[in-house]
Amino acid sequence: MINQHPKRSDEPVFWGLFGAGGMWCAIIAPVIIMLVGILLPLGIGPEGAFSYERVLAFAQSWVGRLFLFLMIVLPLWCGLHRIHHGMHDLKIHVPAGKWVFYGLAAILTVVTLIGVVTL
């Protein structure tokens, strides 16, 4: 017999954050790593485009704060989701694993939010 009142799962929320983090890591993060980690140190790029004053002004704007927040939080959720399910696949069962990994991601999200807002 089919259960008429199935328990609602919270997994779609975590899969959504995992998927968004995975897409961010695949599309946005490599561009930023190449720009900040390779091109800028080599001096390739417009003169003064990434001066301290311009980067600080960007980081303190609402678009910059949103970008920094997403650049930190989305890969964080993706990574902790992968670790949680990877440990499950390896049959390493952490007591209250969902609370440990997703709770850590939530705490670090709040810490990141506080850090970005007070920038």
UniProtKB/Swiss-Prot annotation:
Localization per record: Cell inner membrane
GO molecular function list: succinate dehydrogenase activity
Membrane-related topology note: Multi-pass membrane protein
An annotated GO BP: fumarate metabolic process
Origin superkingdom: Bacteria
Keyword Transmembrane helix listed: yes
Record key words, sorted: Cell inner membrane, Cell membrane, Membrane, Transmembrane, Transmembrane helix
InterPro entries, A to Z: Fumarate_red_D, SQR/QFR_C/D
Signal peptide: none
Gene Ontology CC: fumarate reductase complex; plasma membrane
Cell membrane among keywords: yes
Residues that span the membrane, as ranges: 24-44, 55-75, 99-119
Function summary: Two distinct, membrane-bound, FAD-containing enzymes are responsible for the catalysis of fumarate and succinate interconversion; fumarate reductase is used in anaerobic growth, and succinate dehydrogenase is used in aerobic growth. Anchors the catalytic components of the fumarate reductase complex to the cell inner membrane, binds quinones.
Sequence similarity: Belongs to the FrdD family.
Binding partners and assembly: Part of an enzyme complex containing four subunits: a flavoprotein (FrdA), an iron-sulfur protein (FrdB), and two hydrophobic anchor proteins (FrdC and FrdD).
Protein name according to UniProt: Fumarate reductase subunit D
Record organism: Cronobacter sakazakii (strain ATCC BAA-894) (Enterobacter sakazakii)
Lineage, highest ranks first: Bacteria, Pseudomonadati, Pseudomonadota, Gammaproteobacteria, Enterobacterales
Gene (name only): frdD
